[in-house]
Amino acid sequence: MTKDMTTGSITPLLVNFTIPLVLGNLFQLTYNAVDSIIVGKFVGEDALAAVGTSNPQKTLAILFINGMCLGAGILVSTAFGAGDNKLVERQVSTTAIAGTVFSLAFSLVCILLANPLLRLLQVPEEILPIAVNYLRIVFAGLIFTFFYNFLAATMRALGDSKSALYFLMVSSVLNIAGDLFFVEVLGWGSEGCALSTVLSEAACCALCLVYIRWKIPVLQLGRRWLVFDSSLLKKTVSYGWASAMQQATVQLGKIAVQAIVNTMGVNAMAAFTASSRIDDFAYIPQQNIGHAATTLMAQNRGAGKKDRVRKGFFCGLKIEAVYAVCITILCYFCAEPIIRLFADQPEVVELGVRFLRLVSLFYLMPALTNGVQGGFRGLGDLKITLNSSMLNMAGRVAAAAVFVLILHMDIEALPYSYAVGWVLMLLYEVPALVRCLKDGTL
C-alpha cells in the first residue's frame, strides 16, 4: 500500500501519517520501559544500571543505521512524488545492497569495541561485565536492525506509515514475552533481555518482507533486488551519511552526558536511566512528527508543488507544539508514580522525580527544533540539520561538564544543560529558516 501525498488536504494527510509514527514509537518506548522494569524488578539495581549505561551506545549504533535509512528514504520520497517508479526501484535495491555490507562490518566493529568503549566511559567495575555482554548480543543483531529500519523507512517514504506500526506492535509483544521467558523463567538476566530484542527484530524483518511481497507493487522487485546502480550510490551515501551523522551526533552527546552521570554514583545512574526512559516519550515522538513533515515535503518537492511544501512545514510545527504541551503536563504532574515503575529505592525515586519535573518544563524547545529540522530535511538541506545538532550537543556536554564537574551541582544540572543546547540550536536554526522563507526556498 502506498499513499500519494501530493494531492488532498494537507492537515488531514499529515495528521493521519503522523499518528501511526507516534503510536509506533510510543509502543516501542513502552516495551523499552517494560524492558527496564523487568530487568530492575527480576534481576536488580546493578543490572538496571548496566542496561541503562549501555543504552546510549546501543542507541548510537541503531540511530546511525536509522539515519542512513532516513536519508535514503528522502530520495525515495522525492522519486515517488515525481512519479518515477523505476528510479524508486533502483534507489531501494542500491540502498539494500550497500546497507547490508555496511551493517555487517559495523556490527563486527561494535562487538570488538564494546569493552574498551564502556571502560572509556568510566562504567563502574561491578557492572562492567553485565554491560559488555548485553551490548555484544545487541550488536550481533544489527543486520536485523538495518533491514527493519530500511524497510520501514521505505514504506513511510511511499506514504505508508501504518504497516510499520503493525509490525512494530507484534515485535514489541514478542520482545516483552521473550524478556519474561529469558529473564524470569530461564534466569538469563540482562543477556536474555538482549537476546529477546534481537529475535523480535528478526521476526519484524520477516513480517515486513512478506507484506511488501504481497501488498506493495513498486517494491516487488524479485531479482531486481540485486540491481546495484553505482550512479545513485554517491547521492545515497551523501544523504544517508549526513542524516546518520546528525543522528549519531545527538547520541554521542548523550553518551558524553552519560559519562558525566557515571561519576555521580549508582543511585544517580539508576535515576537517570529511569528518567531518560520517560524523557524519550517526549523527544522521539517529536522527532517522528518532523519525519512525517519530511515525507510530505519531499514528495511534494519531487512533484514541484512548492506551496504544499510550505504548508506542510507549518502544519508540522503546529502538531509539534500541541504534543509538547501535552507531554509537559503529563510528565510534570505524574513524575513520582512514573519513576516508581522503575525503582523502589527512595534515593533513586527522589532523584528521578526532580530530573523529570525540571526537564519537562523545557519540552517546547525540542519540539520547535525537531519541526524545523524536519523542514530542512524535506527541502534536501541536511547540512543545516547536522550543524545544528552538533551545536546542540556541544553546548549540552560543555554545560553538563561545567555544572557537574566544576560547580558540583546534582542531577538537576542535567536538564539545565539540555536547555543550553536547545537554545544554541534555535539560535542557529531560526535565522537559517528566515533566510529560506525570504528567498523562496520554503
Question: Model regions: which residues?
Answer:
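Short alpha-helical transmembrane segments in multi-pass integral membrane proteins
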Residues: 1-18, 76-141, 185-241, 297-362, ...
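N-terminal transmembrane alpha-helices
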Residues: 5-43, 59-71, 75, 100-107, ...
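Transmembrane helical elements of multi-pass membrane transporters/channels
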Residues: 16-35, 137, 148, 171, ...
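Helix-terminus/linker motif at the lipid-water interface of multi-pass membrane proteins
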Residues: 26, 30-49, 118-125, 181-188, ...
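Alpha-helical transmembrane segments and their lipid-water interface positions
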Residues: 28, 32-39, 62-69, 73, ...
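Small-residue hotspots at the loop-to-helix junctions and early N-terminal turns
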Residues: 43-56, 131, 135, 194, ...
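Small-residue-rich hydrophobic transmembrane alpha-helices
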Residues: 48-108, 145-164, 271-335, 366-380, ...
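Short runs within selected transmembrane alpha-helices of multi-pass transporters and secretion channels
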Residues: 69, 137-156, 164-172, 193-208, ...
